[in-house]
Amino acid sequence: ASSDTAKKNSGGKMALQQIFYGAPGTGKSYEVNSITKKNRYATIRTTFHPDSDYSTFVGAYKPTMANAPVYGAQGVEIAKEKRITYTFVKQAFLKAYLGAWQKLANGVDSVEPQFLVIEEINRGNCAQIFGDLFQLLDRSGNGFSTYPIEADADLQNEIAKEFGQGGEYMLANEFNVDYAVPDYISNYGKTLTEDIKLGRILLLPNNLYIWATMNTSDQSLF
């Protein structure tokens, strides 16, 4: 498999973003898998298809069954029963995004990489799937996204919850990444670090690697 490198990482050893392309059976997925497994890199994988969209790539609220309280006439909880509630379900991109920031924030001597591997990237409508996330793929020399973007309300709330106290991806209190975008001006009067922690903006960290495979013989291309 050959590769199309979009941007080298700041260390110059691995490309932050690249596409492995070729005919079927030429070892595209094998090459990606051998690199990530050999080095024991944290990896989240997804496969694009014609029905893929932003919600299946990033996340969205979905109905789930959960125990909900049942209240009596006096307003006192008397029992619990299964009811349909709506929960934000994280998908591949958001899991990788949260994992990368956690590794960057909590790394002491070194920062572990986080990989997001997209199989068959050409089988999905990338404009529909990525949306404004495309802007984040433009990386600066330091490996961070050049242009932070605003997160929508649902995504903002989920990120703030996960990065906050008790969250699955809780960030270290002393974490500071203001250096990532030197000319950053917040729309909220805050620092870059604060806006990232609160989920107000999205910014790819320099340890998030997005690698994809593309089948050049596939006829269902977008």
Mark where each language-model region is.
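AAA+ P-loop NTPase catalytic core and its hallmark functional loops
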Residues: 1-222
